[in-house]
Curated annotation (Swiss-Prot):
GO terms for molecular function: rRNA binding; structural constituent of ribosome. One of the primary rRNA binding proteins, it binds directly to 16S rRNA central domain where it helps coordinate assembly of the platform of the 30S subunit. InterPro entries: Ribosomal_uS8, Ribosomal_uS8_CS, Ribosomal_uS8_sf. This is Small ribosomal subunit protein uS8. GO terms for cellular component: ribonucleoprotein complex; ribosome. Belongs to the universal ribosomal protein uS8 family. SUPFAM superfamilies: Ribosomal protein S8 (SSF56047). It comes from Nautilia profundicola (strain ATCC BAA-1463 / DSM 18972 / AmH). Keywords: Ribonucleoprotein, Ribosomal protein, RNA-binding, rRNA-binding. GO terms for biological process: translation. Gene3D superfamilies: 3.30.1370.30, 3.30.1490.10.
């Protein structure tokens, strides 16, 4: 039994990127789908697609690599965990890794990257970081 689908999904993405795989499959959740939408908008993954296999849903993620074959994802980490939730105000999420990285924040306006959350002046739970 898996307790944290987001942590599992991020680990699968990290492992697939280290192995140089083109596509990896994740378990589906609405939150994971929203996180992947942020990754896609920010250019960390090529695309993702929700597929149904009987009564189960999965997400197929196509990873992105540069011209040398290196993954564009250097590091992806879960920040807020089930035992230790991390909440930040909008002032605290302005920049991450001097603008080279992205924090994914769950706000009352939806799941947003840190720069959009700062523009909208909303804080929330920091789900993960990627750069």
């Amino acid at each position: 039994m898996m307790n944290d689908i987001i942590a599992d999904g991020l680990t699968r993405i990290r492992n697939a990127a280290m192995r140089g795989l083109e596509v990896t499959q994740l378990n589906h959740s609405k939150l994971m789908e929203a996180v992947l939408k942020v990754f896609e908008d920010k250019g960390y993954i090529e695309s993702f697609k929700v597929v149904e296999d009987g009564n189960k849903k999965f997400i197929n993620v196509t990873l992105k690599y540069d011209e040398n074959g290196n993954s564009v994802i250097n590091e992806v980490k879960k920040v807020s965990k089930p035992g230790r939730r991390v909440y930040k105000g909008y002032e605290d999420i302005k920049r991450f890794k001097n603008g080279y990285g992205t924090l994914v924040v769950s706000t009352n306006k939806g799941v947003l990257p840190n720069d959009e959350a700062y523009k909208l002046k909303v804080g929330g739970e920091v789900i993960c970081s990627i750069w």
